[in-house]
Amino acid sequence: MSAVIKHSEERLMKVLLAPVISEKATFVAEKNEQVVFLVMPDATKLEIKAAVELLFKVQVESVQVANRQGKQKRSGRFNGRRNHTRRAFVCLKPGQEINFTEEAK
């Protein structure tokens, strides 16, 4: 049951907000061959997969998403909250690689 779903290129360009470059993301990338992205809160797994394949010209094996709640913070006597974020853990097929540390050409 392989349904081909067409997404507009305009929407796919907006789905990925930024790559996550952190110690944990680097560990996951090395161990599980995954790449971590911040994505739009309403992005689906199929949209994330299509966006990564379109922008980086790689083949995606699977996508896992995690919704992170914003932390409660206090500034003086005022309470606030950081924004909620949605992260996508994109597993690439063997032999595929996205490297953000190289210099752009």
UniProtKB/Swiss-Prot annotation:
UniProt key word Nucleus: no
Stored SUPFAM superfamilies: Ribosomal proteins S24e, L23 and L15e (SSF54189)
Keyword annotations of the record: Ribonucleoprotein, Ribosomal protein, RNA-binding, rRNA-binding
MF GO annotations: rRNA binding; structural constituent of ribosome
An example Gene Ontology CC term for this record: ribosome
Gene Ontology annotations of biological process type: translation
Pfam family, one: Ribosomal_L23
Domain of life: Bacteria
Family matches, as InterPro entries: Nucleotide-bd_a/b_plait_sf, Ribosomal_uL23-like, Ribosomal_uL23/eL15/eS24_sf
Family: Belongs to the universal ribosomal protein uL23 family.
Function noted in UniProt: One of the early assembly proteins it binds 23S rRNA. One of the proteins that surrounds the polypeptide exit tunnel on the outside of the ribosome. Forms the main docking site for trigger factor binding to the ribosome.
HAMAP family: Ribosomal_uL23_B (MF_01369_B)
Binding partners and assembly: Part of the 50S ribosomal subunit. Contacts protein L29, and trigger factor when it is bound to the ribosome.
Protein name stated in the entry: Large ribosomal subunit protein uL23
Gene: rplW
